[in-house]
UniProtKB/Swiss-Prot annotation:
Alphabetically ordered keywords of this record: Ligase, Phosphopantetheine, Phosphoprotein
This protein's name: Uncharacterized protein C162.02c
Family: Belongs to the ATP-dependent AMP-binding enzyme family.
Pfam families named among the record's database cross-references: AMP-binding, NAD_binding_4
Keyword Ligase belongs to the record: yes
Amino acid sequence: MLCDSSESVSFSSISKEEDTPIARLLKNAKETPDHRFISVYNERGIVAKYTYTELLRRVNTIAKFCDDLGLGKTVGIHMGHELDFLCSIFALWATGRTCVIFNQIWSQQVVRVLVKRLNISDLLYHEYKPKFEVDTLNATSLASLPLDIDAPCIRAGLEPEVALINHSSGSTGVPKSMPFLMKKYALGYDYGTPEFMNHLSTPMVMATSFALTTLSWINALYCNGNLLYPSSSISATCTSEAERLAWNVYYALRAGCERLIILPNLLVLTLQIMPDKEECFPACKLVAAGGEMVPANMYHTCKRVLPNATIYPQYGTTESGLVSFLAYNGKDTLHNKELVYFPGKTVKKLMLVTEDNEAVPEKIGCEGFVCVVTDVQSEPYVGDDAETIQSRNSTFINYDGQPAVRFADLAVWNSYKGKLGITIKGRLGRRVKRNGVFFDLKYFDQVVVGLKEVKDAFSFFIFNRFVLVYVPAYNGVDPVTLKQKLNKELRDHHLFSSCFPLADIPRNAAGKVDLKSIETYASKCLSVEDQRLPVLLNPVAIEISKIASKILQNPSLEGKDAPLYSCGLDSIHSVRFFHAIQSHFHLEGPIRYNMNSNCTPNSIASIIQKKSYNVSSITYELLNEDACALSRTIPKLSILPTNGQYFLLTGATGYFGRRFLEYLVKLNISVVCLVRESSDEAAKERLISLVPSLRISSENIIVWAAHVEEIRFGLDDAKWEFLVENVSRIYHMAAEVHWMKSYQELRPANVLGTKTVLELSVMGPKALYFISGGGQQEVELDDDTQSAKASGYALSKYVAELLCRKISDLGHPLIYVIRPGFIIANDGEILSRDFFWRFVATALRMGIWPQSDESQSLVFHISTTDALCMTLTQILEKEADAYAPLLAYDKFDGDEFACICESMKNVKLDFVTLEDWLKALEKDVDEKGEDHPLFALQHATKFALKSSMTPSNGLRNIYPLSETFLTKEAIANGLENLYIE
């Protein structure tokens, strides 16, 4: 029977801790008995409804049944989204019992462990009969339990101290058990985020044991919301469980759901399976997407289908209980903006901490593990096995005498609209650090699975190498070809060292992917591969292999003739490697510039023994011959009619390129952008993700996938002819910037790419503006000594400029070569690999600032993005001189720069000579190692800082000198965002 309305129950008089879910259910049944709390839907719409009155009757029935059976104190529930799922939980709580929600994918082994660990005596089920059998577990079906309208009404006050024992996913073995106290539900029922609009109707589409599921039904109960349950009879042809869930979401939207609390990837999958791509659901008011990383295009993909929905990326953990974070800048996810999460009001203290649980400074860019102090967290893990104890000690910590939860996720302090929050960087295990740079293995996995040759895949970082384990999509997939295709997709020909096929992905006892077994398999395959390498006999080569083995931390390379770049010798390790070789063999020449990407210990030994290391294999004469030979293949100047409607822009995704594109769009100029991607659609998505203001919705902006190193950029005949007929001006900015690669390695992109641009420019002719790098050496190579000292990047730019000169000499009237200085953004964005800001950060951290050897101020050649945009579009239109490279930078006083740094960063800088500063830098790099900002660029630092003293040889500077205020603005904005350790 229902509660007697004559009973003197005053719900308003109870304390907040006493306002348990049972008390709230009774309150709702009394005050709003006809409120529809649960609705069941299928593909035809709502097929059943249950009010609080009907819900309470079923709860009373199950509660009497539980007492009659004499169930134990801890009871398992093995159910899907069905009426008896919630009714059983309420009934068990009302009779003083703790609930454990069983996951349907748990194996017999996992169930045995959990039953023993938690002393579970009984299990309730209804539609879904358990597939496991445990001798000590009594399974009881509620399917045949009829409604008993005479069953006594439950009452509050008998609830157990522990309400639910939640569980982790179990991805590393047996799931961890987390008790959650009954009293905490009333303290944080809205998870501290009332923006969730808990009164809205919400479908239950994810696993019943999932933390977001508990969030949904608890806050719906406390806020008089409405739950939508998918009928088990929904008819849909599905190839996977994920697709079945996606159909459940789709039919919930058709049934009029107002809110989705959902996994991001499930939401995206739902939009993909929709039969009518033009269909939209204006009834949906809110989407909270959490539980996994948010795809960059989620907001914009959803906005058309859910036009009236507020879309929040959501973040939290099962361990933190009723704590939730929201990212209010979710709409910026496609605009190269990092999501910034803010905690709800249940968080008393938010910190980022080190592995030793020391708080990191609350400054933008500081990294640590997310840690919260709150009154509504779960209790520490239950269990006495070694792994549980270790996890418990590292997760549930004490901070200033208060219990706290340390998440497994790394994050950095960030800000949005002036408020400090956190940006999630991912789990430590799937996020690896190489040379001070973090790589997301999960991102690599997603890229690989997108290839047609791969069914499933996981990447690993072993012995400083990225390796892939994959399940082929069909027979005959060649691992070598797959590696080449993957590296091309990732735009780094040596990123992945090896690909190893696997028949199927192994699963652990919890049904999750067994990453440990896969990584062990990858390590064994890699070891076998290393053992097959040729054995070295040359003593010099053997010594070189020992050096490589030590630097790459891979003992198996010792004595083997291994291709070093494929074994993890990237740009930063190569600095240490070649420096070690020069020290070991007492060499004086710049041996690193003699190396190519296929170098091995034997090939390096050959160079050393021939004593050819001090003369570059690329001579001044060869560079000129290369330029002459290439220029002869470029067609002669031709006068062609052209519509001249478009500008062509290469390098639009670059640091300056994307800002220049924004500038052109503001001027209402039509632009064709060539973007390095696999398809036009991928090129558009990438460009939109980088250029916030860009909307590719008209013919004014055309985006094509292209590769500058390929013939005609890899475009088909129709696209090439379009460029010939419709482009009047070309801005060529695309380049491969790499300070350690040789000329031959950079020639395809930087030289042949410029050749293709010139081939297009002679058709018309079309005005060509070639932006030749930024801040690199301004030297005219006139002897082999200079060519031996120059980097491969500088050599490639030299030949590209030489090509432009030769075509200009043949009569092309509209070729401009522009040499900027160090390019810095007026909006303050700092490029992590940018030399200039690395130098500034180093100087501030060391507390000393360089001057010239005569104690005079250094001069920095700086080009701000705003001023450079004006230069390229306005000033150059007035230039009519004969061909000569044009300088485009502001000469900014170094001492004035130092004063700005002191003021904005509140530090005191001592001035020293450049030579003394470089000595201090060498010591600083030795102490900090490869994490030092200038580790990889130490060899180029002196030249870069002295570049202002290089004579300009009469070259004209066309930079708007009246715009010095823009330089100061860019410096100030950059310093605002610069993090100093």
